[in-house]
Amino acid sequence: MSDPEGETLRSTFPSYMAEGERLYLCGEFSKAAQSFSNALYLQDGDKNCLVARSKCFLKMGDLERSLKDAEASLQSDPAFCKGILQKAETLYTMGDFEFALVFYHRGYKLRPDREFRVGIQKAQEAINNSVGSPSSIKLENKGDLSFLSKQAENIKAQQKPQPMKHLLHPTKGEPKWKASLKSEKTVRQLLGELYVDKEYLEKLLLDEDLIKGTMKGGLTVEDLIMTGINYLDTHSNFWRQQKPIYARERDRKLMQEKWLRDHKRRPSQTAHYILKSLEDIDMLLTSGSAEGSLQKAEKVLKKVLEWNKEEVPNKDELVGNLYSCIGNAQIELGQMEAALQSHRKDLEIAKEYDLPDAKSRALDNIGRVFARVGKFQQAIDTWEEKIPLAKTTLEKTWLFHEIGRCYLELDQAWQAQNYGEKSQQCAEEEGDIEWQLNASVLVAQAQVKLRDFESAVNNFEKALERAKLVHNNEAQQAIISALDDANKGIIRELRKTNYVENLKEKSEGEASLYEDRIITREKDMRRVRDEPEKVVKQWDHSEDEKETDEDDEAFGEALQSPASGKQSVEAGKARSDLGAVAKGLSGELGTRSGETGRKLLEAGRRESREIYRRPSGELEQRLSGEFSRQEPEELKKLSEVGRREPEELGKTQFGEIGETKKTGNEMEKEYE
């Protein structure tokens, strides 16, 4: 380092300070130290500049000069925090951890900054690593300790770690590469991977032609190699003081003992690991990281499958739970086939080991997969199997709602309404307003499909009230729109109802008119049947009068003729017995004169038909002309009935009359 006294300084103190800080940040610690020295030449004793140059010396490994500048910065102001911190850092690097801890505490009391707090922590750790913590030391009362004399204690107390000046500046009488003589085994343990670099640099020192070369800055290759070796030696010495080899061996033994103790407590540790893993899997899934949740679940499942039943007594239940977690993550990723397989494995394990809760969980998840892919009937079958396993009212509420929703998708509105009402009832028992809202909407939608618009409006209004309670604006808008549609449906139904009623009234009027016509028709037919009877009665009466007149005339003639007195008496007797004789001989006369009787009977029938057919035919013609367009078949039947009745009546009456006339004529002939 050049002497500023021999040179003429051409800049100012702030310029040299700024230059030194820039070079320090660039890693040019030697040049930065030179700039700070120039600044101190212009303004001697500046404490900030002394601290800055102390940092440069510390980075260069010149610990004594670093400590000297740090102490010089505290001469004018012992409470200067930057100086205290720099002195503590230098003492810590030198391996004097106890004094470094003292200055860290002193600075922390003056200004509780993060640098002092971190310094206290690392100094305490270094002390514990060097001498061990009280928990790792076991005092044993064995043997005779009288050989430990006061002198030996004083000698041991005077043995302090010396500064590493001899490492940085080796003596002239010995080679440079022998400046750091340490145990190779110790150095290998301390340096670790850097030990290979140290061996390489030492091999380069053996090449005499190489070490004689010079660099552009005037430095020799030998100086560069020695700088690297000294750096490694310095840090290995620091690491040995920070954590000596015996401390490393002690820690290794402590780790082995700890592992043995942990191995004995493995069941509890395993349970903690499992619970923590399941919480992480669930947290990843709920936070939206389905891929991370799936990877974590598969990793834990692979590890659990390697364990035996002794380590994890409920291994089967745990495996089923992990399959369920994997399936849920696969659902979120859209891997429905894989999710279905995972949940079916969970169901198989639950059935095999009789785990009701796991079975309920698996059926729930399988139903969700079926519903996601549109297989609503399979989802219904799966969820209906889960109904007996549902324990809480809230679980039943959700289950009934999902089943009803599937029935609604299948256009089975009655079933959807039934399950919706069950869900509504369970939600009211639970007091869950959110599920009351969902159930009311489901019931209303089913009633709309059933065209029960009034009930649908009532349920939509209930759902709207609950949506306002939970401040669900989207649900409110959807329900209002559905209410409008339901009200329009009511109007349409009312219009249809009025039309049907009018049509019904019209049809009833026509039916009553038709009945009146039928009654009128029946009256006409009765009149048709009654007219032949009246004609027959009138004809019988006229015949009786005629016979009476004839008898009176004959009786008068008999009285006028005295010669026929005897005949008149006999004729009177004959008349008195005429009815009995005619009645008694009617059978014999009919038998004897069959031919004559049949001819007379047929003649009488023809006469009656000609007489009685004429008015019935005219009536039939009139009625057929009036009603032929409406009821032709019924009119034909009635006309045939009307035709048959007078014919039968005529046959009966005219047969008897013909026989009576025949008998009377024969009696008169015999009497004459």
Swiss-Prot record:
Q: What is the first-listed, main subcellular location in coarse terms?
A: cytoplasm
Cellular-component GO terms for this entry: 9+0 motile cilium; 9+2 motile cilium; axoneme; cytoplasm; extracellular region; outer dynein arm docking complex
- Which GO terms are recorded in the biological process aspect for this UniProt protein? brain development; cerebrospinal fluid circulation; cilium movement; epithelial cilium movement involved in determination of left/right asymmetry; heart development; lung development; mucociliary clearance; outer dynein arm assembly
* Compartments where located: Cytoplasm, Cytoskeleton, Cilium axoneme
Which tissues and organs express this gene's product? Expressed in the nasal mucosa (at protein level).
**In its UniProt record, what illness is this protein linked to?**
Ciliary dyskinesia, primary, 35: A form of primary ciliary dyskinesia, a disorder characterized by abnormalities of motile cilia. Respiratory infections leading to chronic inflammation and bronchiectasis are recurrent, due to defects in the respiratory cilia. Some patients exhibit randomization of left-right body asymmetry and situs inversus. Primary ciliary dyskinesia associated with situs inversus is referred to as Kartagener syndrome. CILD35 inheritance is autosomal recessive.
Q: How does it assemble?
A: Component of the outer dynein arm-docking complex along with ODAD1, ODAD2 and ODAD3. Interacts with ODAD1; this interaction may facilitate the recruitment and/or attachment of outer dynein arm docking complex proteins, including ODAD1, ODAD3 and ODAD2, to ciliary axonemes. Interacts with components of the IFT complex A, including IFT140, TTC21B/IFT139 and WDR19/IFT144, and the IFT complex B, including IFT46, IFT52 and IFT57. Interacts with CFAP53.
Q: Mind telling me what this protein is named? A: Outer dynein arm-docking complex subunit 4
Q: Which organism is it from?
A: Homo sapiens
